[in-house]
Amino acid sequence: VSAEQSLFPYYTDDKITENNENTGSKVILLVRHDERTSLWEPFSERYSGNYHIERNIYKNVIGTAILFEEINHSLGLTYRYAWRTSDTFGFVKTSWLINFGRSCCQATLLDGIQNILPDNVTSLTQNTFSNLLDAYKRSEVDLETGLAIFALNSILTDLAEPRESLLATTVMQLGLENVDYYLSSQILDRFRTGMSIVTETEVRGQRCAYFVRTEFELGSGTERSWHLVADVIQDSAAIVNLTNNLISNRSAMIKTLEREIEVNNSNLKRIVASADGMQVSSDQLCTAHHFANVMFNVMRGGIFMDQYNILKRDFIEFVHMRNC
């Protein structure tokens, strides 16, 4: 984990709380039942009291996924999203919209992430020159693939020398069809009020954002799911490779993504198991607590290379050094 290679600004907890409306995940829904259209903005306090809602937060036992859930009993809909990671794909935001009501509905979805950091932005720069930094930001999206690239026009410097920013942050969507793309948060209020919004292909001098808009019908007892996938430290070769995969293998990428996440989970379990972190008992909470403790110990101190086997020569040298 590095504050110098983050997807969002690396802030203290109080700033994260204060900026929850303009940083990170943001979803807005226009839901139509018959002739009535309802505006629903999950996890926002803008329309507090308008609906009978229930909110939950979950984390899996091994700590690789965190899931946020808002149940709207008034509309008969549940929206969930989870943050997970993948060695190959980066940060994965997976969303689900579930209709548990008795009637079908038509949903217009606007989903995305805000205040994305381009690459080559240090935490010191973000915390000291955040407003100046915005002027250097450039966002663009390839409409054919939906792949967005967020970069700096140049690295901030007060010296008379060229300093190119050759790395970027990328975001793409998987699982949605007939999608419009937007690159700034300025379209949010227009969407809330039902006004038309124009697809954006390039934005300069503004905080980076990635939004997708689409419409679909959701029958009673059915659900839709999709992914927003972001990664940092991407060079031109990686971006070209990702673009080609989106063109030729888009449908297969979802299965590859889920398989990759499962492989990462298995690898983490194997690492923790090598430090005796796996146990089974009648107390599930105690078992989960033990796993977490061992995992954090491993993060601090590492694991043995070959279980409890060591080289005789190394052991003799260690004993000699400590006792001479």
List each language-model region with its residue ranges.
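Anionic coordination/interaction segments
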Residues: 1-324
